[in-house]
C-alpha cells in the first residue's frame, strides 16, 4: 500500500474517534500499549539522529533511536525507529506528527508492536554503539540536598525541640484524661450527689429567706394598718409628693428638659393642693372643738337659770297659800 494512503487512513481513524468520543481503552492505540517504539518513514536523507530527536522530543523523552543507514556508504535510508520513555508519548506522536512535512517531504508515523533492536556487528560505528547501549535519554543528576546555613539550621533545631515539647504535653494530657476516665463510677456518683446536695441546700436557704422577708413585710403592713398613727403616717407618705418625686427620679432621669419642667409644675400644684387639704382639715378640727366648748359653757348657765325660776315660783306659791289662810 502506498505510504500516503496509509497516512490518510490513520488521520481518518483519529478524526472519527474524536467525533465519536471513543475512550482510550477502546481506541485502536490500545493494541500497542505494551510497546513504546514507533516507526518514522519518509524522512529527508540529510537528517541525522540529533535532528530527529529535536523534532520528536516535543511529546516526550526519547530513550533510544535507530536511524537505518546503508552499510557500505553510511547514508540514511529515510526511516528510523524511536523509543519513548513513556508509552503514552507514542499516541501523541502518531496523532500529531503523522502527515506533517519536513523539508518538503511528508512523513509517516505509526506504532510498532514488536520491535527488536539490531544486533551488534563489526561495521557499526562507535557512536551508534553508545546509543544502542546507553540510549539517548538525558540522565538527570542525583538530587543533592540543598545547602543549609547555620541560622537556618539553628531555627530548624529550635522548631524540632518545640515540636517534641508539644508532643510530650499532648501525651501527658492524654494520660491524665485516661486516668480520669478509669476512675471508679462510685467516686463520680459521690461527686454528683455532693453537687446536687449543695444546689438543694442553696435553693432551700433562698426559699426560707424569701418566706421570712414576706412574713416581715406582711406584719409591718398589718401594724401600720391597725394603728391610727400608722394609718395617718401611711396616708401622709402616700400623699407626700416629695417621696413620689424621689422614687420617680431614677426612673425618669433620661427625660428631656421640657418633660422635667412639666413635672415640676405638676409637683408644685400637688403641693398646693395637699397644703390646702391639710389646712382645711385643721380648721375643721378647731371649729368643732370651739363649738363643743361653747355648748358646754352654755349648758351650765341654762340649768342655773332654770333652777332660779323654779325657786321663785315655789316662793310665790308658798306666800299665796299663807295669805289665803290668814
Swiss-Prot record:
GO terms for biological process: mRNA splicing, via spliceosome. It is found in: Nucleus. Its main location: nucleus. It comes from the Eukaryota. There is a cross-link at residue 8 (Glycyl lysine isopeptide (Lys-Gly) (interchain with G-Cter in SUMO2)). Pfam families: RRM_1 (PF00076). Residues 36-114 form the RRM domain. Residues 191-200, 207-219, 236-245, 255-273, 313-326 have a biased composition (Basic and acidic residues). The keyword Transmembrane does not apply. Transmembrane segments: none annotated. This is RNA-binding motif protein, X-linked 2. The lineage of its organism: Eukaryota, Metazoa, Chordata, Craniata, Vertebrata. The gene is Rbmx2.
Amino acid at each position: 500500500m502506498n505510504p500516503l494512503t496509509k497516512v490518510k487512513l490513520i488521520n481518518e481513524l483519529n478524526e472519527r474517534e474524536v467525533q465519536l468520543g471513543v475512550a482510550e481503552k477502546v481506541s485502536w492505540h490500545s493494541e500497542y500499549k505494551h510497546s513504546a517504539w514507533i516507526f518514522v518513514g519518509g524522512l529527508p536523507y540529510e537528517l541525522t539522529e540529533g535532528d530527529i530527536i529535536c523534532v520528536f522530543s516535543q511529546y516526550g523523552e526519547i530513550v533510544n533511536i535507530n536511524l537505518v543507514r546503508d552499510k557500505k556508504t553510511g547514508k540514511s535510508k529515510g526511516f528510523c525507529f524511536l523509543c519513548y520513555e513513556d508509552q503514552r508519548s507514542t499516541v501523541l506522536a502518531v496523532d500529531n506528527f503523522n502527515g506533517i512535512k519536513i523539508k518538503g517531504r511528508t512523513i509517516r508515523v505509526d506504532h510498532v508492536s514488536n520491535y527488536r533492536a539490531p544486533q551488534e556487528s563489526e561495521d557499526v560505528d562507535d557512536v551508534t554503539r553508545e546509543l544502542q547501549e546507553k540510549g539517548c535519554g538525558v540522565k538527570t543528576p542525583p538530587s543533592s540536598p540543598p545547602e543549609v546555613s547555620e541560622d537556618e539550621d539553628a531555627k530548624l533545631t529550635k522548631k524540632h525541640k518545640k515540636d517534641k515539647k508539644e508532643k510530650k504535653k499532648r501525651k501527658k494530657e492524654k494520660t491524665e484524661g485516661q486516668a480520669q476516665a478509669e476512675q471508679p463510677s462510685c467516686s463520680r456518683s459521690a461527686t454528683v450527689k455532693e453537687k446536687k446536695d449543695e444546689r438543694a441546700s442553696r435553693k432551700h436557704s433562698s426559699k426560707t429567706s424569701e418566706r421570712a422577708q414576706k412574713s416581715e413585710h406582711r406584719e409591718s403592713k398589718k401594724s401600720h394598718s391597725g394603728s391610727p398613727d400608722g394609718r395617718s403616717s401611711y396616708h401622709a407618705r402616700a400623699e407626700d409628693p416629695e417621696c413620689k418625686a424621689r422614687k420617680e427620679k431614677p426612673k425618669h432621669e433620661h427625660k428631656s428638659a421640657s418633660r422635667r419642667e412639666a413635672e415640676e409644675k405638676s409637683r408644685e400644684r400637688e403641693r398646693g393642693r395637699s397644703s390646702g387639704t391639710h389646712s382645711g382639715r385643721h380648721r375643721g378640727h378647731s371649729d368643732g372643738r370651739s363649738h363643743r366648748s361653747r355648748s358646754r359653757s352654755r349648758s351650765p348657765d341654762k340649768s342655773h337659770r332654770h333652777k332660779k325660776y323654779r325657786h321663785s315660783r315655789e316662793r310665790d306659791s308658798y306666800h299665796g297659800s299663807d295669805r289665803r289662810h290668814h
